[in-house]
Amino acid sequence: MARQLPPGYSLHEGYPPAETYCNLRKNAGLSVRSLEQAQVVPSGSWYGCMISYTPPPTSTNQQNENASEEQTEIVAMGRIIGDGGWYFVIADMAVSPNHQRKGLGDHVLKALIEKIRSSPVVAGVLKSGGPKPYVNLLADEPGRKLYEKNGFVYTAPHSLGMMLEWD
């Protein structure tokens, strides 16, 4: 049985607004990105999801019907870059520090994996026993246990991740 999100948290499909995306990356310890870079994330992605948090009502904010909507914040995100057929890259896995250690990253990752698994091409290939899709990510130290727990394995020594070092 799937674990439920803690009270006040909700999973949504889509991408955070560019400013929220940048702040969440920065606050979670990922590399800083510009607003211009963040604005093209939705068009350059295959799928994304995020988790929002709304604090429980208190006597103060119950007076104002819009209080909970105003207090809702996006606290976790992740996305998939891919072709929809066989090649997928998990990216931008981030959880706000104040909301870590609650299983939110696990919920985001499981939602991303399930989206890949349930896509028509992948589902058909998995059912027929055809070549499996290639799903990869770059695993920074804080996320490695999470990724291993969800079935990811190190590719070394067969292959190693590399990046272009810009001048």
State what each model feature region is:
Residues T54-Q71, E114, S118-G130:
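Intrinsically disordered, low-complexity domain-flanking/linker segments in eukaryotic proteins
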Residues A38-P57, N64-E69, I74-A94:
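A conserved beta-strand-loop-helix scaffold within acyl/acetyltransferase catalytic domains
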Residues S96, Q100, D140:
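Residue-level recognition of the GNAT/N-acetyltransferase active site
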Residues H99, G103-A111:
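Conserved acetyl-CoA pyrophosphate-binding loop and the N-cap/start of the following alpha-helix
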Residues P120-D167:
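Conserved active-site alpha-helix within GNAT-family acetyltransferase domains
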Residues M1-E36:
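Short amphipathic alpha-helix that is part of the acyltransferase structural core
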Residues M1-G8, T58-E69, D167:
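Eukaryotic N-terminal low-complexity, Ser/Thr- and Lys/Arg-rich leader segments
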